UniProtKB/Swiss-Prot annotation:
Keywords noted in UniProt: Acetylation, Cytoplasm, GTP-binding, Initiation factor, Nucleotide-binding, Protein biosynthesis
Region described as G3: 444-447
Chain segments carrying region Disordered: 45-302
GO molecular function: GTP binding; GTPase activity; guanosine tetraphosphate binding; translation initiation factor activity
Cell compartment(s), UniProt: Cytoplasm
Gene designation per UniProt: infB
Stretch list, region G5: 534-536
Protein name stated in the entry: Translation initiation factor IF-2
Biased composition (Basic and acidic residues): 92-217, 267-280
Region (G2): 423-427
Residue span, tr-type G domain: 389-558
Top-level taxon of the source organism: Bacteria
Major place of residence: cytoplasm
């Protein structure tokens, strides 16, 4: 192979001569532009570049393992503790020569170990064989001896077996009888002891009560004890109260009334044991009859806490959680307060909070999923169809005004960019194009910073990302963001270097800048294809399509064509005549007109389908974008679209999703309100800009809401009172009037009834078609609500030369104005040795015994400081004024 010059090699590598010379210098080879390069020097350069662009020298892997440990605590409760074990391992990349040496050493060591292992196995095999032979001989001898013993013992065993069984049964029976008698004796002694103690205590109580109630002279002491029996049960306490009332009311009628007669109406509130105790309490004194009937407590407190399996759904109230754990609601509230959360008994809490509380109280938690119906509906699908090749879904991404839509226009031979407001894309456009080599579906995403979520949705729904970079502008912020979205979705990237026909185009600069973010061209050893195109001149369009189809062929994209369809919502909006309209990209199956679809919170039957050209179609296969009509509402962009069999079940699932979303949202709102309670109490007055937002499509509503909420500061907050898709209605105008909000319409207009309300209420209605203008005007409105910044500006300095006494003003400072101008009634500071010792107001300013309003630089004057007489020679009087600076939101 002949040597080539530096210039020739630079042309082959499509790089500048200076850069190539610098790369040779970095590799340790000094060359000039006209020098020749040998094959060995080329290889040295390639090795240097590969080493420079190689991966990191050190790789650290971290692993976390979580487990739960039940620890017993005081009170018999057990507490579940979450344990996290963290492991860390670092791999260091070795030098190639060092790696080869270590590999050779390891190989030699493995061979030596293998040789030693084989020798040990052979030795062990020989020993095992010898041992087996010895054991076989011994075994034969033992078996012969044992056979003889068994024959002799068999005869004795048959005769003695029956005698042994009889003896064992008799011994076991005697032992059980002895144990039963012992237990019975102990139980009788314990019961007798308790009855004697109870009887003594009851008699003592009766005597004491009889002495206190001297008016019951005719009653016997034993009858007194029945009236004032120890109140060990609910029935006995009620009987005692009844007896007291009867005695108090019937003192004049007689003393022999039966005082402790229970009422029959109270039997529903007591147990059988309570009624027996009450009867014993009433009749306990008559000859000792039924004295020891049943004074023992029936309920025994558990020795330790009972741990239950608590089943928790996605949301639960505090009261329901307490019932599941069989505790009082106040205990659950106390446990939540210990965890730092305030709650009421009827408050709805989320699953995570309920799980923490239940585990803190020592119970085992079982998390329940409440979407069984949803899973059943989604799993009831056609299966078994074979996968077929499908068209690739390609997303065009890049910075704003880099020519994404214009590039797509040339491919589609239409003029879409001219129809976009301000010439920038503000929706996701979905189109499919037929080429000579096959069909390609394109998604065009907006490049403005506000449409981050739209670009992320585009990357998630795609197979290949075409990254459009202007050759004259290079890599910009949204270009970097598009690269991040593509990497997050693990989608291959094809780079289209646009505007290549401009004289200031520099494609090498684009390659170098993209290489910093991991996008390397194939000629540099990377995986990304770079295609130079011009959307205006049409240069390189065919090469771009070939590159896309080549990448799709490598990916081997397949999908099931027959069966129930599934896909994703790319965009959605509310049409005045057609109702909710959703742009759907079919991923699998075939979507037919009349199918029942479930789409996020919405459902419905497909009444009509149109392609991107507005033509009616009856079906749409994989990778085909269509607009569908017939949904119950406007779905959120990014929702999954699924064809289901039963419309009733689809409606139930949609309603369940709406209810679940609302419950989770309310639980989070309540939690945030309680958490921010003290912050809201301490913060000052905050101005709010209320906005009612209406836009033409769901994606624009989402993007504008995010952008406006990010403008909020500590002093001025943006509050989206209401938002939606479609024109401005009378309801929107009424809401804006009630909340003193600004009405914002993005690519929509107000209807006649709304305009009447707007005129009557003098509402602020603003129309926009470009998102830049909307954000700038809201920012200006917020800036007007900011309090101005106060700044002190020094306007003059005066040096005290002498001090005079005045009967009217006290000490007067004779001064020379050294800088600026001194004005009357301005605030001043008195400085001594460059330290402020007094701050006040200039009360008197005279020149030649005349009052003046100001004295300029270089003139003498007399200054009287208000309420300050400690002016000395050498002090400096600093005169300043306070100016207001209007602040703006950055």
């Amino acid at each position: 192979m002949t040597d080539v010059t530096i210039k020739t090699l630079a042309a082959e590598r499509q790089t500048s001569v200076e850069r190539l010379v610098q790369q040779f210098a970095d590799a340790g080879i000094r060359k000039s532009a006209d020098d020749s390069v040998s094959a060995q020097e080329k290889q040295t350069l390639i090795d240097h570049l590969n080493q420079k662009n190689s991966g990191p020298d050190k790789l650290t892997l971290q692993r976390k393992t979580r487990s739960t440990l039940n620890i017993p605590s005081t009170g018999g409760k057990s507490k579940s503790v979450q344990i996290e074990v963290r492991k860390k391992r670092t791999f260091v990349k070795r030098d190639p020569q060092e790696a080869e040496r270590l590999a050779a050493e390891e190989q030699a060591q493995r061979e030596a170990e293998e040789q030693a292992r084989r020798e040990a196995e052979e030795s062990a095999k020989r020993e095992a064989q010898q041992k087996a032979e010895r054991e076989a001989a011994e075994q034969a001898k033992r078996e012969a001896a044992e056979q003889a013993k068994r024959e002799a013992a068999e005869k004795d065993k048959v005769s003695n077996q029956q005698d042994d069984m009889t003896k064992n049964a008799q011994a076991e029976k005697a032992r059980r009888e002895q144990e039963a008698a012992e237990l019975k004796r102990k139980a009788e002694e314990e019961a007798r002891r308790k009855l004697e103690e109870e009887a003594r205590r009851v008699a003592e109580e009766a005597r004491r009560m009889a002495e206190e109630n001297k008016w019951t002279d005719n009653a016997e002491p034993t009858e007194d004890s029945s009236d004032y029996h120890v109140t060990t049960s609910q029935h006995a306490r009620q009987a005692e109260d009844e007896s007291d009332r009867e005695v108090e009311g019937g003192r004049g009628r007689g003393r022999n009334a039966k005082a402790a007669r229970p009422k029959k109406g109270n039997k529903h509130a007591e147990s059988k044991a309570d009624r027996e105790e009450a009867r014993a309490a009433v009749r306990g004194g008559k000859g000792g009859k039924r004295k020891g009937s049943s004074l023992q407590q029936g309920f025994q407190k558990p020795a330790q806490a009972v741990n239950r399996d608590v089943v928790i759904g996605e949301t639960i109230t505090v009261g329901e959680l307490a019932n599941k754990m069989a505790v009082k609601g106040s205990q659950v509230i106390k446990a939540m307060m210990k965890l730092g959360a305030m709650a009421t008994i009827n408050q709805v809490i989320d699953q995570e909070t309920a799980q923490l509380v239940a585990e803190e109280m020592g119970h085992k938690v079982i998390l329940r999923r409440e979407n069984e119906l949803e899973e059943a509906v989604m799993s009831d699908r056609d299966t078994g169809a074979a996968a077929e090749p499908r068209a690739p879904v390609v997303t065009i991404m890049g910075h704003v005004d880099h020519g994404k839509t214009s590039l797509l226009d040339y491919i589609r031979s239409t003029k879409v960019a001219s129809g976009e407001a301000g010439g920038i894309t503000q929706h996701i456009g979905a189109y499919h194009v037929e080429t000579e080599n096959g069909m390609i579906t394109f998604l065009d995403t907006p490049g403005h910073a506000a449409f981050t979520s739209m670009r992320a949705r585009g990357a998630q729904a795609t197979d290949i990302v075409v990254l459009v970079v202007a050759a004259d502008d290079g890599v910009m912020p949204q270009t970097i963001e598009a690269i991040q979205h593509a990497k997050a979705a693990q989608v291959p990237v094809v780079v289209a270097v646009n505007k290549i026909d401009k004289p200031e185009a520099d494609p090498d600069r684009v390659k170098n800048e993209l290489s910093q973010y991991g996008i390397l061209p194939e000629e540099w050893g990377g995986e990304s294809q770079f295609v130079h195109v011009s959307a205006k001149a049409g240069t390189g369009i065919d090469e771009l399509l070939d590159a896309i189809l080549l990448q799709a062929e490598v990916l081997e994209l397949k999908a099931v064509r027959k069966g129930m369809a599934s896909g994703a919502v790319i965009e959605s909006f509310l049409d005045k005549g057609r109702g909710p309209v959703a742009t759907v990209l079919v991923r699998e199956g075939t979507l037919h007109k009349g199918d029942i679809v479930l789409c996020g919170f919405e459902y419905g039957r497909v009444r009509a389908m149109r392609n991107e050209l507005g033509q009616e179609v009856l079906e749409a296969g994989p990778s085909i974008p269509v607009e569908i009509l017939g949904l119950s509402g406007v779905p959120a962009a990014g929702d999954e679209v699924t064809v289901v069999r039963d419309e009733k079940k689809a409606r139930e699932v949609a309603l369940y999703r709406q209810g679940k979303f609302r419950e989770v949202k309310l639980a989070r709102q309540q939690k945030s309100k309680l958490e921010n309670m003290f912050a809201n109490m301490t913060e000052g007055e905050v101005h709010e800009v209320n906005i009612v937002l209406k836009a033409d499509v769901q994606g624009s509503v989402e993007a504008i809401s995010d952008s406006l909420l990010k403008l909020s500061t500590d002093e001025v907050k943006v509050k989206i009172i209401g938002s939606g898709v479609g024109g401005i209605t009378e309801t929107d105008a009424t809401l804006a009037a009630a909340s003193n909000a600004i009405l914002v319409g993005f690519n929509v207009r107000a209807d006649a009834s709304a305009r009447k309300v707007i005129e009557a209420e003098s509402l602020d209605l603003r129309y926009y078609s470009v998102i830049y203008n909307l954000i700038d005007e809201v920012k200006a409105a917020m800036s007007g609500m900011l309090s101005p910044e106060l700044k002190q500006q020094i306007i003059g300095l005066a040096e005290v030369r002498d001090v005079f006494k005045s009967p009217k003003f006290g000490a007067i400072a004779g001064c020379m104005v050294t800088e600026g101008v001194v004005k009357r009634h301005n605030p001043i500071r008195v400085l001594r040795d460059n330290v402020v010792i007094y701050e006040g107001e200039l009360e008197s300013l005279r020149r030649f015994k005349d009052d003046v309003n100001e004295v300029r630089n270089g003139m003498e004057c007399g200054i009287g400081v208000k309420n300050y007489n400690d002016v000395r020679t050498g002090d400096v009087i600093e005169v300043f004024e306070i100016i207001e600076i209007q602040r703006t939101i950055a």
